[in-house]
């Protein structure tokens, strides 16, 4: 088991410090042939239980000052990032890493939320339509760094979906065919979703035909019909029942269904299929490492060894030809 790409997150309010942290990592990655994807995680630092430790920005938007924002990030922090600053910060990042082939992708916003007052898709409202943000920011990035991939996450939608085809807790891309992200440079767009078992996501069923049908409707059709690539920007599970309310059986069902789907084994249920050396749907495991006291989904134990349950799932992924 191994990996060839690392996803690292940054915050608008701490961008200068984040770039200082990233630079030596990018240099080390270049020496080892590992690629980097940078993701904007939240606008503000300083998270706690009130906003699930910053797992997502609770106002559901990509900015927290002006526009549709109430002047906070929705999690108790005063807002400092306007829509304009959000774009400017991404252009700063793009310029900083222009000319290196190690930083290959920019994940424009981590886990936007399709909550009331949060992100929408295809509404045409520049204050909330995240598709329009992806176009504005993506094209501004490509103007200074045309080689990089622009990664556009579907808003996590627990209530329904933009196309009215059922909830999309992993990310709602149900309108991405009818209302696509339009970039000025071809072949640079990658859509993305995040998928976790119920003890993390709260989404049920964990797997099986109903889960497959929901994925087909909300993002899988993009791959099945060759419309656009989709990347699973985060996935992972603990598999031992030691964290929060994990049910190990549910996590195993989740993993079986998702891995089969990503590998093209569920074509008889409408999922993507792949032939011969074709690559399956690419993924990013959260997290590759060990955090003392926070072994939510990490792949390593305290000794640095791969945890068997994670390895058993990870090694099945059809990640390369």
Regions found by a protein language model. Give the residues of each.
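Non-catalytic accessory regions flanking glycosidase/transglycosidase catalytic cores in CAZymes
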Residues: 1-5, 20, 31, 35, ...
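Catalytic domains of carbohydrate-active enzymes, especially glycoside hydrolases
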Residues: 1-11, 37, 217-225, 275-282
């Amino acid at each position: 088991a191994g990996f060839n790409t690392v996803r690292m997150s940054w915050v608008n309010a701490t961008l200068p410090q984040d770039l200082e942290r990233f630079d030596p990592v990018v240099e080390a990655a270049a020496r080892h042939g590992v690629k980097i994807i940078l993701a904007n995680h939240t606008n503000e630092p300083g998270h706690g239980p009130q906003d699930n430790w910053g797992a997502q920005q609770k106002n559901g938007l990509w900015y927290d000052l002006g526009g549709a924002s109430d002047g906070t990030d929705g999690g108790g922090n005063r807002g400092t990032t306007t829509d304009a600053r959000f774009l400017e910060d991404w252009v700063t990042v793009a310029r900083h890493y222009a000319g290196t082939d190690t930083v290959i992708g920019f994940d424009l916003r981590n886990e936007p939320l399709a909550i009331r007052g949060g992100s929408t898709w295809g509404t045409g409202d520049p204050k909330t339509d995240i598709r329009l943000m992806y176009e504005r920011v993506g094209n501004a990035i490509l103007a200074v760094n045309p080689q990089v991939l622009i990664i556009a996450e579907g808003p996590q939608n627990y209530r329904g979906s933009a196309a009215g085809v059922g909830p999309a807790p992993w990310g709602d891309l149900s309108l991405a065919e009818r209302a696509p992200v339009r970039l000025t440079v071809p072949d640079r767009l990658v859509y993305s979703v995040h998928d976790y078992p119920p003890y993390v996501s709260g989404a049920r069923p964990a797997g099986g035909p109903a889960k497959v049908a929901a994925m087909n409707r909300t993002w899988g059709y993009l791959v099945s019909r060759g419309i656009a690539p989709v990347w699973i920007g985060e996935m992972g599970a603990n598999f031992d029942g030691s964290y929060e309310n994990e049910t190990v059986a549910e996590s195993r069902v989740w993993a079986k269904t998702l891995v089969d789907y990503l590998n093209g084994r569920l074509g008889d249920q409408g999922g993507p299929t792949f032939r011969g050396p074709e690559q399956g749907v690419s993924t990013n495991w959260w997290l590759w490492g060990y955090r003392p006291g926070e072994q939510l989904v990490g792949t390593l134990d305290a000794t640095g060894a791969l945890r068997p349950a994670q390895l058993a799932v990870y090694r099945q992924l059809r990640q390369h030809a």
